[in-house]
Amino acid sequence: MKKIFIPTPLDESIVLPKDVTHHILHVFRHNIEKLITVTGSDNRCGIYQIKDEINGLAQASLIEYIDSPTAMHRTILVQSYLKGEKLEWVLQKATELNVDTVYLVPTSNCVAKYDAKKLQSKYSRWEKIMLEASQQCGRTQLPTLVVGETLSNVLDMESESLKLVAYENEEGYTIKDALKAINSDSTNRDILICIGPEGGFQEKEINDIIECGGQSVTLGNTILRAETAAIAALSMVHYELEL
């Protein structure tokens, strides 16, 4: 069943936006009376039946509300700024790997620079990438994208999480080792993963994360590109927690 998101709360009857209508009826060629799963801006989820198309807008009626699956652990990616397509690729693949929240932060070695104006201009495109990835992979909840915070602020905001930082000089401690701790004591701690930019984290930044209760982890014997590291780390978490 096709899963879609709309920018309004759910109700007994809903009108799908024009772009969603086109996607459902003319790209996927679903017929009137077809059932779809819809998530609204209120994060409620329901099964709807398409009833009609009027002026390019599909009209749908509620069949039943359904519960959205909730994970025991919230997964958080703290991604240093990357250049253009690399960052967009990370956002897309992180969404497919069921990340819950993505923080985009400036760190010392970032090649890409985003001031407030540039962040604002890019934000809607980044959100659209994550929305389309969510619909493609069948998620019922959209991940949250947060920009404009510093690494220090994020660590404070997520102080109760299990904080991990991918570090090329860490030799033995893995994500699997770190997750054993929360699996063994049955806690529902959120899992936060920090990934550096193309130039990696500076040693001071690694130490700052560790001083906030973080742990450096290795992603293997090879040094990965920044965008590869993010997806590798999330894949490891996904495997350990969900498979």
Residue ranges and their predicted role:
Residues 1-68:
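N-terminal positively charged helical leader segments and presequences
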Residues 36, 61, 69-78, 183-189:
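Mobile, glycine- and charge-enriched loop segments
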Residues 60, 142-146, 216:
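Generic structural signal for residues in well-ordered beta-strands
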Residues 65, 107-109, 221-222:
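Short, ordered loop/turn segments at secondary-structure junctions
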Residues 69-165:
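RNA substrate-binding interface of SAM-dependent RNA methyltransferases
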Residues 158-200, 204-205, 214-217:
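Active-site/ligand-binding-proximal alpha/beta "capping" segment
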Residues 203-243:
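Structured adenosyl-cofactor binding patch, chiefly the S-adenosyl-L-methionine
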